[in-house]
């Protein structure tokens, strides 16, 4: 595990700070140890997840693989919280998709109304031209 695979220090520090009770500090060496432990745990969970995906004949790790791996490495107490997070994430993505669809519909309506405005302006211009040319003929 090279240094290029280290977790971002600022993020690790933010997580540690949020986890500590008020008034409790964490030594720099402790922060480094926590970051290294988190990195090892990520590698371990990833390897276990890969096992489940490859047994299913897939090369992509799915959430199902991660949940199975969590159970296998005896961290099933994390599973309910992660399932809630995944459900919330999916819900949020659906809402974003709906908002994008609404924006696209609004853009289409604007385009249509702009086309209608352009057509009516063109019709007005051509009717003015024809009325002015008929006046000229008189």
Curated annotation (Swiss-Prot):
GO cellular component: CHRAC; epsilon DNA polymerase complex
Region described as Disordered: spans on this chain: 91-138
Location in or out of the cell: Nucleus
Record GO biological process: DNA damage response; heterochromatin formation; leading strand elongation
Keywords: Coiled coil, DNA-binding, Nucleus
Residue stretches of biased makeup (Low complexity): 129-138
Residues spanning the membrane: none
Basic and acidic residues bias spans: 91-126
GO molecular function, one term: protein heterodimerization activity
InterPro entries found in the cross-reference section: CBFA_NFYB_domain, DNA_Pol-Epsilon_Subunit, Histone-fold
Quaternary structure and interacting proteins, as annotated: Consists of three subunits: pole, pole2 and pole3.
Stated name of the protein: DNA polymerase epsilon subunit 3
Organism of origin: Dictyostelium discoideum (Social amoeba)
Gene that this polypeptide is encoded by: pole3
């Amino acid at each position: 595990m090279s240094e290029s695979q280290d977790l971002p220090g600022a993020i690790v520090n933010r997580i540690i700070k949020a986890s500590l009770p008020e008034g409790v500090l964490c030594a720099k060496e402790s922060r480094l140890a926590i970051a290294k432990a988190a990195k090892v745990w990520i590698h371990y969970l990833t390897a276990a997840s890969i096992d489940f995906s490859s047994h299913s004949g897939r090369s992509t790790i799915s959430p199902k693989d991660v949940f199975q791996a969590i159970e296998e490495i005896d961290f099933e107490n994390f599973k309910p919280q992660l399932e809630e997070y995944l459900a919330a994430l999916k819900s949020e993505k659906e809402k974003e998709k709906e908002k994008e669809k609404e924006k696209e519909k609004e853009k289409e309506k604007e385009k249509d109304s702009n086309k209608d405005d352009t057509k009516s302006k063109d019709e007005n211009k051509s009717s003015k031209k024809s009325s002015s040319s008929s006046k000229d003929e008189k």
